[in-house]
Amino acid sequence: MADITIGVVVFPGSNCDHDTMHAVASFEGVKPVMLWHGSHDLQGAKAIILPGGFSYGDYLRAGSIARFSPIMQEVVDAAGKGLPVLGICNGFQVLLESGLLDGALSRNRDKKFLCRDTYIRPVNSNTMFTGLYREDEVLSIPIAHGEGNYFAPPEVIESLEEHDQVVFRYTDREGHVSDEANPNGSVGNIAGIMNRNGNVLGLMPHPERASEKLLGSEDGRRLFASLFRQL
């Protein structure tokens, strides 16, 4: 049986593509391939990952130029047909700019770049990305971003909550949602959301940086495992 192909998109300025490739390659029966930003070829990928970094130098606005790349034209079209797409950090920003997810990400409330471990809780374990998590567990997964402050109009937030599209929230070590546990000011402590169809997920924390013991946490590994078992 052939390995399942997972496409990892590479933009100019991506810097987590190799980390993501390494995490994906650690799963048996899964083969990561790099998808260059200037290509229209998804290479038969059964899922797409948009990794972290600073696509196109984050000029104008994080993710705003990447949305116009040839590869994103194909990703948007494929996502509309049900292809699973995961956006991590800058990848989340690209998903928002591309219209695959609702809302926007602005500068962190303290206007500083944040790079540290943080705690998040899966608040919806009934998705293709979170099926191996429990909703009462607390995950230790690092963040590294300057524009991670998620916001959207009240009616969008209400719709996200109503349709269980909020997937992760920032919490403290005990799993309590509070302003003190919110690293960047995101409305409702939102760390990750998905689309209405459930095949597109964006989150600011980096699961690929919490995917093996050597990194200090394996809490992010089950996100990839949850996705791959659905393919």
Curated annotation (Swiss-Prot):
SMART domains: GATase_5. InterPro entries: Class_I_gatase-like, PRibForGlyAmidine_synth_PurQ. Its main location: cytoplasm. CDD domains: GATase1_FGAR_AT. Pfam families: GATase_5 (PF13507). SUPFAM superfamilies: Class I glutamine amidotransferase-like (SSF52317). It catalyses: N(2)-formyl-N(1)-(5-phospho-beta-D-ribosyl)glycinamide + L-glutamine + ATP + H2O = 2-formamido-N(1)-(5-O-phospho-beta-D-ribosyl)acetamidine + L-glutamate + ADP + phosphate + H(+); L-glutamine + H2O = L-glutamate + NH4(+). Residues 7-231 form the Glutamine amidotransferase type-1 domain. Keywords: ATP-binding, Cytoplasm, Glutamine amidotransferase, Hydrolase, Ligase, Nucleotide-binding, Purine biosynthesis. Its EC number is 6.3.5.3, 3.5.1.2. It is found in: Cytoplasm. One of its GO terms (molecular function) is glutaminase activity. GO terms for cellular component: cytoplasm. The active site is at 89 (nucleophile), 206, 208. Part of the FGAM synthase complex composed of 1 PurL, 1 PurQ and 2 PurS subunits. Part of the phosphoribosylformylglycinamidine synthase complex involved in the purines biosynthetic pathway. Catalyzes the ATP-dependent conversion of formylglycinamide ribonucleotide (FGAR) and glutamine to yield formylglycinamidine ribonucleotide (FGAM) and glutamate. The FGAM synthase complex is composed of three subunits. PurQ produces an ammonia molecule by converting glutamine to glutamate. PurL transfers the ammonia molecule to FGAR to form FGAM in an ATP-dependent manner. HAMAP family: PurQ. This is Phosphoribosylformylglycinamidine synthase subunit PurQ. The lineage of its organism: Bacteria, Pseudomonadati, Chlorobiota, Chlorobiia, Chlorobiales.
